[in-house]
Amino acid sequence: MASNATFEVEIYGNTTKFENSLRGVNTAMSGLRGEAKNLREALKLDPTNTDKMAQLQKNLQTQLGLSRDKATKLKEELSTVDKGTSAGQKKWLQLTRDLGTAETQANRLEGEIKQVEGAISSGSWDIDAKMDTKGVNSGIDGMKSRFSGLREIAVGVFRQIGSSAISAVGNGLRGWISDAMDTQTAMIALKNTMKFKGNGQDFDYVSKSMQKLARDTNANSEDTLKLSTTFIGLGDSAKTAVGKTEALVKANQAFGGTGENLKGVAQAYGQMSASGKVTAENINQLTDNNTALSASLKDTVMQMNPQLKQYGSFNEAVSNGAVSMDMLDKAMQKAADGSSGATKTIRDTWSGFNEDLSQALLPTLEA
């Protein structure tokens, strides 16, 4: 990729410019994953369409180039981190995990490109173009068994050295304890909010639902808990808050969004929910973090609300204040309802594994 301030990527037939940074790469990748998903669906319906195969091949090759570029950027950033401070250690851990994900993603893409090349050669989409995660899952199961004593180790560490535990234990454990602490803080905020709103009796239902959602998707408990807390704070019932959070998280993943993308999507959506207004600024923020999801929501809102056609476009309807949060909520739910068959990637599987371990450590914080 060029070293200038921006780079260009073709998505859905349109050339788009992105900031030449990790954030820009993540945004471009999100849009490309959404396009790849649509191309695969189209090939299931028209398995001899070699033009679609060629488009998918080009898409995957672009993703591969971006993944390699991301790995290079992460290595460069890692080399500048000061591991002598707790903040530096936390940043180093996050960057190391992101680097592993980027390199794994590149390996997966190389395999998918070979599958598509085979389909082009045969002239038929007669392959199951999903990543085989059997080996990955067995590897993760092995890691889980090796960490069966994780809780006992963590309890011992906390009792012996208290607050300095994070900097004293191994790299992986340090990251999981940090995640567990973030989850605990988010749980306390949820509990206090629910008590204040008068529905504290539903805390167990909401907290368990959010933890399960995090295990089943590429989100983490901290983000799902914070999002449900926002909805409850705005007056939603426990059931409604859980439903809205599940819809947002599942839709983000279904349209190629990562757990990191979810933070930006959730922030934009939460701000609109809090103000009760759909704004161009927040929609742009949502687009920056998940291009494919944003495009789908815009199209779905227009289809579900024929009265908006008088404005010519979704953006014009927003500018005129004609798009409500209720419209957006229903469109988000529809996007989530269509995601039940979404393929899990290696990254999603790994995110679930990290979440399992982080949640397993929660009891140690009260030991």
Swiss-Prot record:
The keyword Transcription regulation does not apply. Keywords: Viral release from host cell, Viral tail assembly, Virion. It is found in: Virion. One of its GO terms (cellular component) is virion component. Gene3D superfamilies: 1.10.287.1490. GO terms for biological process: viral tail assembly. Pfam families: TMP_3. Belongs to the skunalikevirus tape measure protein family. Tape measure protein. Serves as a base for tail tube protein polymerization and acts as a template for tail length determination. This is Tape measure protein.
